[in-house]
């Protein structure tokens, strides 16, 4: 058979195989469209488990007559209009496939009216033909979608549908998940003419527990621990269940990313790791959690049904969730359902025109619309004692720089609270010996500018680890390995409160000898200061967390060597240990390239400015370019 372009009807039915798995999939897509339209009330009518009728009625903004036929066309949407919109999705839908796919396997009736129209209009499309017929109708402002005889023209798909009770059970679960995502929307679910679920709107956070109890049951409400945790652009809130009640609540697992319901493996793994010492293998944690993240840093376009996402900083998100859940579970006196008493969230002060109904992208607002520093300070004071505040996302800073600052704040949690140090206040004295810590710049400080605090431009790299740079009007060779070692030493020199431990994805089991076990016990406080969480039981050690600079190292080899070094010293300072670690860490690059060299020198200039003014031995070797020129000119 020669290659040919598929007819539109066949292409839509193929797409329907991904989008429309069962009646519950139709309900999910249509209800999400209603939410994107700004609806505050949604009525759902189901007959025969969705096989005969699915009707969704809302009071959203509606669809104009001119757009009605286009709404049923494939790849037609009001949610996005450019690649920039796709990379910062906040609306539930964006592909423009759902209505076209549904109409290709059913008889679909769409009735809608906008506030500007004096009358409503109705569009009808059926099966393979998909010709859209439009006629006047009576309808209030909003939309009603009726899907009749689902899969009537695809017998194979209809044959795989389960019993009426089973299919409605899946619909009920979808509605429950959506109701947990949008407390501000009233949702009614009817089956065969009977009211099955009625979720009243609860815009006030103080009323959220009412809906939580109606969906998850009083048992979950009784054992729920409130969680509210923030760091930089990451925010997580919701409830986790007391591990003691997990055996009765194993089915209660609801997770949302930017209010989009998810079944993401990374999130589930982080939560499971937080519960690992409190549950046996047969038990499952119970939770209702909401993760808010800059939409630029999460890709929702990776799953046909949008059940999974891909995070650009997956490790950071995993560790953030792990720490948040662990902190709540470790608080023995954690208050139950400590819901904020503040009222409704104020209406957004700015929105893009195509996002009015879909929601606010707080990460792309103009500077004038953002809270002042004073307002943010007041908000932090009012927040829960468990909430961790961090500087707001700034659009004029590249995100990778923001992410680097965020990692450094995780590494040194108090740095962001310290006053910034001006470049003029940085001492220009010669660099101390490696046993003395390199002075660290606070995270609030801007990058240093000018020749006094810059090595110069990287011209090229000589493998494996030497960079040719412009230096003080000439050129010089710089050892990237030595620069990396000094940077590691600066990162490992702990502040007064110690380095922040970063949980490992999987705890590491290490076999130790008697001397290493003794060293672990004698230097327990020092290890904690260095961000290393190591517990010893019956001759075996379990490594649960290390500081950020150690995350990429071969810990199975490094930790025994570290304990062997500690066993030779009764007293040792954190700075001395940081120096030892810096000399024993493996390099992140066997062979360097120009971009890696530039990134390294940028970090060194930021954290170790003294190395620029007084390079230590072995770091920099100026090249006598004048002598070479003289040779070439025969002078």
UniProtKB/Swiss-Prot annotation:
Residues 364-377 have a biased composition (Low complexity). Residues 359-399 are annotated as: Disordered. Residues 378-399 have a biased composition (Basic and acidic residues). SMART domains: DNA_mis_repair, MutL_C. The keyword DNA repair applies. GO terms for biological process: mismatch repair. GO terms for molecular function: ATP binding; ATP hydrolysis activity; ATP-dependent DNA damage sensor activity; mismatched DNA binding. GO terms for cellular component: mismatch repair complex. Keywords: DNA damage, DNA repair. PANTHER family: DNA MISMATCH REPAIR PROTEIN MLH, PMS, MUTL, DNA MISMATCH REPAIR PROTEIN MLH1. Belongs to the DNA mismatch repair MutL/HexB family. This protein is involved in the repair of mismatches in DNA. It is required for dam-dependent methyl-directed DNA mismatch repair. May act as a 'molecular matchmaker', a protein that promotes the formation of a stable complex between two or more DNA-binding proteins in an ATP-dependent manner without itself being part of a final effector complex. This is DNA mismatch repair protein MutL.
């Amino acid at each position: 058979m020669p290659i040919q372009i598929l007819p539109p009807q066949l292409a839509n039915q193929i797409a329907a195989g991904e989008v429309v798995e069962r009646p519950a999939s139709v309900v999910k897509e249509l209800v999400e469209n209603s939410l994107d339209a700004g609806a505050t009330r949604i009525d759902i009518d189901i007959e025969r488990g969705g096989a005969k009728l699915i009707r969704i009625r809302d009071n959203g903004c509606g669809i104009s007559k001119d757009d009605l036929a286009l709404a049923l066309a494939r790849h037609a949407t009001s949610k996005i209009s450019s690649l920039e919109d796709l990379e910062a999705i906040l609306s539930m839908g964006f592909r423009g496939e759902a209505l076209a796919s549904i109409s290709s396997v059913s008889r679909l009736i769409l009735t809608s009216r906008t506030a500007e129209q004096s009358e409503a209009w109705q569009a009808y499309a059926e099966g393979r033909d998909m010709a859209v017929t439009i006629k006047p109708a009576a309808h209030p402002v909003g939309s009603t979608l009726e899907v009749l005889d689902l899969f009537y023209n695809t017998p194979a798909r209809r044959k795989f549908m389960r019993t009426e009770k089973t299919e409605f059970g899946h619909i009920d679960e979808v509605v429950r998940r959506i109701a947990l995502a949008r407390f501000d929307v009233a949702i009614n679910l009817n089956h065969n003419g009977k009211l099955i679920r009625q979720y009243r709107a609860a815009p006030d956070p103080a009323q959220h527990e009412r809906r939580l109890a109606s969906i998850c049951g009083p048992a979950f409400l009784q054992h729920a621990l409130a969680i509210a945790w923030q760091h930089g652009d990451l925010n997580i809130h919701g409830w986790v269940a007391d591990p003691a009640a997990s055996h009765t609540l194993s089915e209660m697992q609801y997770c949302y990313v930017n209010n989009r319901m998810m079944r993401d493996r990374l999130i589930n793994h982080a939560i499971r790791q937080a519960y690992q010492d409190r549950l046996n293998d047969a038990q499952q944690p119970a939770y209702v959690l909401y993760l808010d993240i800059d939409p630029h840093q999460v890709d929702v376009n990776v799953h046909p049904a949008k059940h999974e996402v891909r995070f650009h900083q997956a490790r950071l998100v995993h560790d953030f969730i792990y720490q948040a859940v662990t902190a709540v579970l470790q608080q023995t006196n954690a208050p139950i359902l400590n819901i904020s008493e503040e009222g409704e969230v104020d209406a957004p002060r700015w929105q893009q025109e195509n996002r009015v109904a879909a929601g606010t992208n707080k990460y792309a607002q103009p500077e004038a619309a953002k809270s002042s520093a004073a307002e943010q300070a007041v908000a932090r004071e009012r927040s829960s004692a468990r909430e961790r505040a961090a500087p707001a996302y700034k659009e004029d800073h590249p995100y990778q720089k923001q992410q680097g600052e965020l990692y450094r704040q995780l590494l040194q949690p108090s740095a962001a609270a310290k006053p910034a140090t001006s470049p003029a206040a940085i001492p220009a004295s010669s660099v101390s010996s490696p046993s003395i810590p390199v002075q660290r710049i606070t995270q609030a400080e801007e990058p240093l500018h000018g020749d006094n605090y810059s090595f110069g431009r990287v011209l090229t790299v000589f493998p494996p680890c030497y960079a040719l740079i412009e230096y003080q009007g000439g050129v010089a060779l710089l050892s990237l390995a030595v620069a990396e070692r000094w940077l590691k030493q600066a990162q490992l020199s702990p502040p007064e409160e110690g380095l922040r431990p970063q949980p490992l994805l999987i705890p590491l089991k290490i076999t130790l000898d008697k001397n290493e076990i003794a060293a672990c016990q004698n230097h327990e406080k020092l290890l904690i200061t260095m961000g290393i969480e190591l517990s010893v039981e019956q001759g075996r050690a379990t490594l649960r967390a290390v500081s950020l600079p150690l995350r990429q190292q071969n810990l199975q080899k490094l930790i025994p060597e570290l304990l062997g070094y500690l066993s030779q010293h009764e007293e040792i300072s954190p700075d001395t240990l940081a120096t030892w670690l810096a000399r024993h860490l493996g390099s992140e690059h066997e062979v360097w390239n120009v971009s890696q060299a530039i990134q390294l020198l940028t970090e060194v200039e930021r954290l170790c400015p003294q190395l620029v003014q007084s390079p230590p031995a072995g770091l920099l070797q100026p090249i006598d370019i004048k002598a070479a020129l003289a040779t070439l000119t025969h002078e």
